[in-house]
Amino acid sequence: MSLYTTQSTQVSFEMHSALEKFNEHRNTLKMTTGSADLDSLIDGIQEGIFYLFYGNHYTILEAIMYRFLINCVLPAKQKHGFESMGVCFNNVDYYYHDAAKKSSAISPEKIGVAAKCAGIDPKIVFKNLYIHPACNEQHQLLVAEQVADLITSNKDIKLLVVNRITKFFKESKNKMETANILKQVIGIISKACAKNKVALVCTGDANTTARGIIPRPIGGIYLKHAANVIVHIREFSKTSAIPSFKATLIKHQYTKTPKSTILYVRKTGGMVLLD
């Protein structure tokens, strides 16, 4: 449905038949998450849709990030990928000398390991990925504008992964100012992705101080309303050497929520991958 407003403030609506919407959905490109259970929960990753995966266990969110970046490049028919280019918008403290904080930078070694596990030459993946780091909230806003321009100018891009989108909001002492910047960032990238049919995947933090069985995502109401699909992920079992995680679908366009599944990971080449 398109909305147009004339100078006389009259509003007209362009109506679409159910068949048109069905054909549009049927022809929509869809990428696997790399997990049959997660695919079943959210119906894969579709172009033009905004996904938010959030929680406080960074291991699983990082595993999702690397898996999605690789899957974007995979062939569409044989491997259920987008067979296209992807962008990683990484929010990280690059100017710290703390090794633990440096480890949150995107690792070429981990991309290589994940690519080999997916059965694709790492060189092909490297050629089809853009990585844009942001080191503070002001830089985050600048990078958002650059990424939006890149998506608009390069029609081969079908996936944007924003790693730790709420990082600077979580760590900020001036929540009001940072919340406003975060809102601008979300608005810029979500509009660019929707307009150009690019899948938008964000990872974020959970608000552990909030009441309720399932914590809300950090970032305010705007983030919650902007995302089309929202999944909360928490550690489920510590009984084995490799933990499992519970993914709970909080919001979806056409699936009843809440709905949950268990995700498994595997350790390989010094990293954890979604299984």
Q: How does the language model describe each region?
A:
Residues 2-124:
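The Walker A/P-loop phosphate-binding site
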Residues 48, 126-129, 226-228:
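Short, well-ordered alpha-helix to beta-strand connector turns
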Residues 52, 159-163, 201:
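Structural motif
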Residues 56, 90-93, 165, 205-206, ...:
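Short, ordered loop/turn segments at secondary-structure junctions
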Residues 68, 72, 181-195:
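Catalytic-core regions built around general acid/base machinery
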Residues 83-172:
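Conserved inter-motif catalytic segment of the P-loop NTP-binding fold
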Residues 164-186:
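Conserved P-loop NTPase nucleotide-binding/switch module
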Residues 187, 191-275:
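Phosphate-binding/switch region of NTP-binding enzymes
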